[in-house]
Amino acid sequence: FNKDTYYVGFDANQGAEVQGQMVKDYIEKNIDKIDRNGDGVIGYVLAIGDIGHNDSIARTRGVRKALGTGVEKDGEINSAPTGTNTDGKAAEVQDAELEVNGKKYVVRELASQEMKNSAGATWDAATAGNAIGTWSSSFGDSIDVVVSNNDGMGMSMFNAWSKDNKVPTFGYDANSDAVAAIAEGYGGTVSQHADVQAYLTLRVLRNALDGVDVDTGIGTADEAGNVLSEDVYKYSEEERSYYALNAAVTADNY
């Protein structure tokens, strides 16, 4: 990059952590009813968007890290799909232990797969809808939570099965239909703060055109007093990048 080049986007790794923590918080808050068959195992299934996509990899790792089911491979949490994992012996994940109110539960990733259709398209909502049908036939009431790398796949699974069976489903992107579905039992989603990304983009451009410091109106107030709060963005000087921070959208704040 030259000295006048900057990047604006969202923090994928921070967003992945937000999604994982959102799922864990929901489980802990609803521990008295989350275990549908009472077997002491909190089972979840995971819809993976694209096994080679950075955002998909980050989100899979974020969920597994938060729930304790991740295993390391080459210094990072393994993000590969497990296929089915009925007995908890899949190499890609591990059973985790979660203690809430003095009681211990096993957390298990029952199944995960890349949602790729026959034409090769990834992040495919229809494939996710079919997958939840297969998983529900295989696992039944062992599925306590449904997690997806995005809302497109998440809503497909929610509408196909989770909603009628009252199983919390979590996605990512804060799509309007997903946010609206929270009132119907959708567990939650993650906002990438598109408004902050848009403001950052326009502000960096405006500052460049005006010949003022790039941080004007972002980290330092402009003449009109415009400035962003530190909880909605971060700046990486090494990467010359502005990142909007992600936020959980749940029944508590939607």
Regions found by a protein language model. Give the residues of each.
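A residue-level marker of the well-folded mature domains of exported/periplasmic proteins
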Residues: 1-254
